[in-house]
Structure formats: structure tokens, C-alpha cells
Amino acid sequence: MVEVTLLGSAQDGGVPQVGCDCCLDLEQRYPVSIGLTDAEGGKHLFEATRHLGDQLRIWGCNSVDSVFLTHAHIGHVDGLGLFGKETMAAKGVNLYCSKLMLELIERTPHWSTLLSDGVFIPRVATVYQFPGVIVEAIEVPHRNELSDMHAYLIKAEKTLLFLPDHDTWQETLRGHDLRAWLNHFEVDIALIDGTFYSADELKHRDQSKVPH
């Protein structure tokens, strides 16, 4: 049976977030991540956060077959190093990402060693097939200082959209309304960017500089 497990739902910094005094007493929440279990028990992790150990514990496993990355912003990738020799000492983990994301990994010394050491095997495509499930990458607009951004459609008996970050619905939908856009991709379940409740949420910062 194909299953998706929610492993985190917070923005890059998690909760409580460093530098924020309004959430110190809130229950801890991990940065956004999901785990996909395919029909033969293969484990596919979406995003590599700094809370990798806690999130694998939630998932009930201590290793994964593959990692999917949506983009290069810190909360989605700062757990990559935990797969290396200092921690997990993993080998042969498939790494699914865009061409631009892979190029960034290759020119970042701390990450490129994960490729040369055989920790990750990079796989660049737009459609990936596993037992009982297909994963399709969809490019969406989001601050591309370092790489592009891709959401993922996970297609099994039902279709789930994993869209943890984007800039604005106007740019993502490109003239379509939200319901029509979701219907076009035959989405049954949508996990979407909910970083900000309102445009006035950030104190002492210009929210237009960090669109979500």
C-alpha cells in the first residue's frame, strides 16, 4: 500500500523559530517534510531538514531509499549533510532534484563531497516511477536566488500535491483559478504553502522580500 506521512509543517526555521519571541511557548513543529512509502516498502523522503533524526523517528525508519528536493532554501536542504560520514554514513541514496539544484550541489563543497563519496546518486528528470506510485515535478515561481523551485505530484490511488513554497497564487496559477488548476492535475489532496496568515505578520521586516 502506498502511504504518505506528514513529517513537518513549519516554515524553514521550525517552531519555535530562532529570533522570534512570539512562539517560544508553542508546541514544537518541524520544518516541512513528507515521507512516501511505495507499494513495496521503499522509503522516499521529501526535503532534508535539520530535524532529520526526529522526522525519521516519526516515520518509524532509520534510513531512506531516496530524497526529493523542491529547492535550495535553507530549511529544505540543511539536513543533507546528516547523510554523510559524520552522522548516517549512508551510501547510494537516490537524490531527485532539478538540473539547477544539482548544479548548485555540485559547486557547493560541503554538498559536492556527498556526491563524490557516493552518499547520493543524483537523478534529474521530471517524472519518476516507483512500485505503485508516480512522482511528477512541476516548476512553480519562487525566489530563485540559488535554484528553481518544483512542487511534486504524487500519483497513486489518489493524487497528492506537495507545494511547500511558492511566491504568489497569481504567479503560480498564471491566470487560472485555484480550483481549476487543482482539477487540471486531478489533485485529491493538496499540501500547500501556508507560511503567512496575513501580510502584516512579520515584525520589522518587509514581507515583500520573502514572498510566500
Give the predicted meaning of each segment.
Residues 1-161, 167-173, 179-180, 189:
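Binuclear metal-dependent hydrolase catalytic cores
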Residues 159, 167-212:
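Cap/insert and terminal regions of metallo-dependent hydrolase folds
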